[in-house]
């Protein structure tokens, strides 16, 4: 994976765990004292979200709440980034890309849970983290995946 290819393990602290476990996350934040937090954890499969909606919401929404709570309680975090998906937008089948002012929608459990994750991030930013220089969202899209596939097949 790209994490290994870039040798990031030697350049940063990375912890594998369950973001639904707030107590474990608190211990990790206490031990690591992170300055930058990039939240990419999720239940990422749309089809699975229909079969396991509770797990999807627990992971994508409450997992984000847990991470944001750890950021709120931390004195070390300088920046937080929540990486979500373009699936958060109301899909109007247009030929143009989405922009930040487009409406959130997310009618299936996965998409809706990621929209909720963004709302959690926004709420924590406005309610608790105004002093944090950066607390934002980044929406990945499948165009990046298609680009990578094209590059690998060349």
Model-found features: residue ranges?
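N-terminal Rossmann-like NAD(P)+-binding domain of SDR-like oxidoreductases, especially those catalyzing
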Residues: 1-139, 144
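Amphipathic alpha-helical segments in well-structured domains
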Residues: 64, 152-154
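Conserved loop-to-helix N-cap of the C-terminal "lid" that shapes the substrate pocket in Rossmann-like
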Residues: 135, 149-151
